[in-house]
């Protein structure tokens, strides 16, 4: 596949807050650009463009790139260059397994701690998802989707749980941003989220777990459609 140079891949409003840790911000900004496909698979990463845009030295950018390479989101090729990694099919499956296992265990614990206020927070996120879907704001929809799952994970009482899940699903997230949603995809996701919330509101463990696993499995099945449509963005089997 021909490589494209990722010139000016960062959002215009991507800025560094000098009062916070610069390396961590550089990492988050670059990771977000890769996850949302603003820096697409196979693109050449030009350090100077990034440092000029963010107004920082090359050191934090290089540190961020090394972290992203550890996550297999970036390929560093000595004497050749640095590239955004293709979406790894094996990592997709691995991410699915990790996410499914941890979210199922997390929601079981969350069910022991959930109160009416938490149920209302989840319902509020459903409303925000519905608004984003009605206005075709796909990136906002995904953000609220993640907030929904993060809220449940945090209810488990384990503060690191969502961070582990979020890191493991990086390749899955890239697929989510690949194109406009498939027909009725967002409506289905909202309905599935609603089923999860209502089961949790009733403190029904079996229905809660079934609703969550159905939602996660259905979401993963859609990746096969996008894999065929965008084969050039994926590694070969």
PLM regions and their residue ranges:
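Short linear motifs at protein or domain termini
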Residues: 1-112, 117, 220, 224-237
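C-terminal regulatory/effector modules of DNA-binding transcriptional regulators
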Residues: 2, 182-237
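Short helix-capping and inter-helix turn/linker motifs at the boundaries of alpha-helical repeat units
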Residues: 21, 119-120, 184-187
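Short, surface-exposed helix/turn micro-motifs that flank interaction/cofactor sites
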Residues: 35, 62, 69, 153, ...
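Mobile beta-alpha loop/short-helix "lid" or hinge segments that flank ligand
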Residues: 69-75, 168-170, 185-187
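Alpha-helix N-cap/N′ positions at the starts of helices
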Residues: 79, 102, 124, 188-191
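Conserved amphipathic alpha-helical segments that form helical-bundle/coiled-coil interaction surfaces
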Residues: 95, 107, 112-178, 191-199, ...
